[in-house]
């Protein structure tokens, strides 16, 4: 079934306008792939024979964001705001001397030439807008394109099962959309077979843009596909080149892998292709680091971490995802055997290592703080039952405490599966109102000055002592707070 979203309608209007002006135009790339998979595209891309100047002249609201590469954004106005469609001119690329961008591009009128410069066959499909308007038409094949392939069942067919019920990596391709496909590279067959295959010679595709190696892993994990053998071999051979890619681009790819709901498979593939030891050597070193079986019957630190990643839900918070990945990153360097396997100080070491990883990938200060807080506090749940009331309440004050709860639960489920500590903390956290966790201070520095104290560094300790007593429930009024401070810190 075709989407009914504003984005889709806007893309069709762009296509119709380009066609009416005498240009070729197709839905292309990820949106074509997702439509064939029965998924709702996040955005829509149009490939066209129209030059950027022609696109700019044809539409009243445009943004030439990538004119050097033939990319123009076309905005369609609605009362609720603008909907943007990316329009790219058919092109062929010159050499990629920087491993990221082509040194030169040449506009072309050939859709096939444009497709063959792209990364993977599943991203090299075009949808014909004229046939989208008459979905009952029979299948058609463009000159030089591959004919349609036999499909698997779709909604309404005998034997159909939704994606969540599929036990294998093959996928359904909607029959009505199948009739609109222009396929020069065998992308439909690879969609049906569940294969991520580079277009043409994989070593050339990855030499052009090294980030494509990570993208291939991400697509395979996202769709439950396999990397085609030649594509996987090329990634292994070229994996060290990923270090030439900007850390921000690598970070963004890794974050998508962690937050799309298929993190375990993504990191297994990163390991299998040799990319993991290049981008995250600290995580790669988890392999083979044993753990005490009485606490970790699941196996080594790597297996434990994979089991955490498997529990990350689609759309999970970025700090939680990275916290899950890095929570035990300090274990390999602190491994020792003294009667049993021990990791003394692994939390402190892990925080330092996590800080370096966040710096390397240029996380924001806020992101770094949240990720490191998860690493630093993930072992504290075991002590919660022995905490003083003031300590427990301060524990609950941690930013995004729900993420700390989520990480601890995943940690338990990836090990002994004992949720006693998690239940203890969760029950008390949910039962404790915010005003109890963060009560209004009974006394401030202004009152201390009024009482005769000289401002200085000692104020922090005094106010902390009063707050501790307040959180413990031993004092409840400003007068009691001042009396406690006067008793403990007499005015000299």
Please identify what each model-predicted range represents.
Residues 1-492:
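Catalytic cores of the polymerase beta-like nucleotidyltransferase superfamily
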């Amino acid at each position: 079934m075709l989407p009914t979203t504003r984005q889709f309608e806007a893309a069709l209007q762009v296509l119709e306008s380009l066609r009416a002006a005498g240009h070729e135009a197709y839905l292309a790339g990820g949106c074509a792939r997702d439509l064939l998979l029965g998924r709702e595209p996040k955005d829509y891309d149009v490939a066209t024979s129209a030059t950027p100047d022609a696109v700019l002249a044809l539409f009243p609201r445009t943004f030439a964001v990538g004119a050097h590469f033939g990319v123009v954004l076309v905005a369609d106005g609605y009362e609720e705001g603008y909907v943007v469609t990316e329009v790219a001119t058919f092109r062929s690329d010159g050499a990629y001397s920087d491993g990221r961008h082509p040194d030169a591009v040449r506009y072309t009128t050939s859709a096939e030439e444009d497709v063959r410069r792209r990364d993977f066959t599943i991203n090299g499909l075009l949808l014909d807008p004229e046939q989208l308007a008459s979905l009952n038409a029979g299948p058609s094949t463009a000159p030089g394109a591959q004919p349609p392939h036999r499909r698997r069942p779709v909604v309404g067919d005998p034997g159909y099962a939704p994606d969540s019920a599929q036990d294998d990596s093959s996928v359904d391709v909607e029959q009505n959309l199948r009739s609109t496909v222009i396929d020069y590279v065998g992308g439909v067959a690879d969609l049906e077979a569940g294969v991520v295959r580079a277009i043409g010679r994989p070593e050339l595709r990855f030499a052009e843009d090294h980030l494509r190696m990570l993208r291939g892993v991400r697509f395979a994990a996202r769709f439950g596909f396999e990397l085609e053998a030649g594509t996987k071999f090329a990634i292994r051979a070229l994996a060290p080149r990923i270090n030439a890619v900007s850390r921000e681009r690598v970070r963004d790819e890794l974050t998508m892998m962690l937050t799309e709901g298929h993190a375990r498979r993504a990191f297994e593939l990163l390991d299998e292709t040799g990319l993991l030891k290049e981008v995250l050597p600290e995580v790669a070193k988890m392999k083979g680091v044993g753990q005490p079986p009485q606490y970790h019957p699941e196996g080594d630190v790597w297996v434990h971490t994979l089991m955490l990643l498997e529990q990350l839900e689609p759309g999970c918070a970025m700090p939680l995802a990275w916290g899950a990945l890095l929570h035990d990153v300090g274990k390999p360097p602190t491994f020792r055997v003294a009667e049993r396997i021990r990791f003394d100080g692994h939390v402190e070491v892990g925080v330092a290592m996590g800080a370096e990883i966040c710096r390397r990938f240029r996380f924001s200060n806020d992101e770094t703080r949240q990720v490191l807080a998860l690493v630093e506090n993930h072992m504290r749940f075991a002590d919660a039952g022995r905490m003083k009331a003031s300590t427990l309440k301060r524990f609950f004050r941690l930013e995004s405490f729900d993420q700390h709860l989520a990480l601890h639960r995943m940690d338990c489920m990836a090990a002994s599966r004992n949720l006693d500590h998690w239940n203890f903390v969760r029950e008390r956290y949910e039962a404790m109102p915010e005003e109890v966790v963060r009560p209004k201070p009974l006394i401030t520095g202004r009152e201390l000055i009024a009482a005769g104290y000289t401002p200085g560094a000692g104020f922090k300790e005094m106010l902390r002592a009063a707050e501790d007593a307040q959180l413990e429930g031993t004092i409840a009024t400003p007068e009691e707070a001042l009396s406690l401070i006067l008793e403990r810190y007499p005015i000299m």
